[in-house]
Each structure stands twice: as structure tokens, then as C-alpha cells.
Amino acid sequence: MMLNMIRRLLMTCLFLLAFGTTFLSVSGIEAKDLSKWVQEHQEKHLKHAGLRLKALQQKQTQTTSAAEDKTKPLEEAFDWDEYPVQRVTATGYTAGAESTGKNPGDPLYGLTYSGVKVKRDLYSTVAADPSVFPIGTILFIPNYGLGVVADTGSAIKGNRLDLYFETVKDVYNEWGKKTLDVYVIKKGTGKITEDELEKLNETKSLQVFRNQYKTVKE
């Protein structure tokens, strides 16, 4: 029995040797050449895979950029006609002496009648006659954005609005004086707090529009 096992083992070894010799002879490929071919093939495959991944990443970046570029302005993103309309005459104001008589350093500089600080943002602070638009009223003002009534003014009576801008230059370049229809999104209760204004400006569903209005300070 031992002799039979040795005989089978020898036959197997001879078969494998003959097969390997035949393969190398027919193909003309030496073992070292075969190893080199396998390595080169793997490197080529990995290179192609890397190029495909890079192309996919570039395509994804281009798609994201295109989506951002296609973001509609706030005016076109919603059906504002669903809300009550009010005809107003709107002007612009700043926190400075030219509008409020106050200068930086004054404890009341930049503070509105409601106590919140003036802000140009997704929801900006605006001044109105509280008998027409109570403090806290949210308005959509075409070409200006969303405004929250947080301030009043001695000259702001009736259907008048004063829209906050950072500088006098912004007032003249971006607004001036306009008569237009505004949309009453929500009637105010007579008050507004910093926390409430901040929450409005952090509304997740509207962040895509925020950079259209937010003033970026260095």
C-alpha cells in the first residue's frame, strides 16, 4: 500500500511538471515574464480605476455647482400671491447719524425700538407704523427680501416702510425710494426678541437663500 501511495505521488509530480513545461513552451512565456505581465496588468487596472474615480468626483462637483447656480431668487421660489398684499412707499435707513442721529459708541447705536439690533440678513429689520404693521410683523418685500418689523420712526406713518441697510451707499445703490406691493406673511404681536429673530434667520429650509441678503462682516 505504501508503494502505491509513493507511485501516485510521483505520477502527480510528473504530471504537474509536464503541464508547466508544456504551458511555458507553448506560450513562450517564462515564469518571470508571466509575473511581470500580471503586475503590469494590475497597475494598468488600478490606474484606469483611479481615472474613473477622479472623473466621477469631478462630475459630482460640477453637478453640485450647477445646482447652486440654479438656485432661484427668493422672489421666484414661492407663490407670494397667497399672502395679503399691502401697497407701501419704502425708503432705506442705516444705524448711523444720518438716519438715527446716533454714532458708534452711543449705548443706543444700532438698537431698534423693539430692543433688537438692526440686521441685514435673511430676515432683516425694518421700521413701520405699528398701527399698520405691529412690531413682529413679517413681510416679504420684493427686491429686498424678508423683513421683520422691529423699529418705528417719527416720519414713518401710515403705509410707509424704512428698510435697514448697512451703509448710505447701499441705500442709494440698492434701493432709494420705491412704491410697491409687499406681502404680509405674519401679523406681529407687538414684540420681537433677539432669540426669535435669530431662529427666523436660522430657518433650515431657507438657508439656500441666505447669502443673497446676509451682510458679511470681516
Swiss-Prot record:
Biological processes annotated in GO: peptidoglycan turnover
GO molecular function, one term: hydrolase activity, hydrolyzing O-glycosyl compounds
UniProt key word Ribonucleoprotein: no
One Pfam family named in its UniProt record: 3D
Key words of the record: Signal
UniProt key word Repeat: no
A GO CC term assigned to this protein in UniProt: outer membrane
Signal peptide span: 1-31
The name this protein goes by in its record: Uncharacterized protein YuiC
Source organism of the structure: Bacillus subtilis (strain 168)
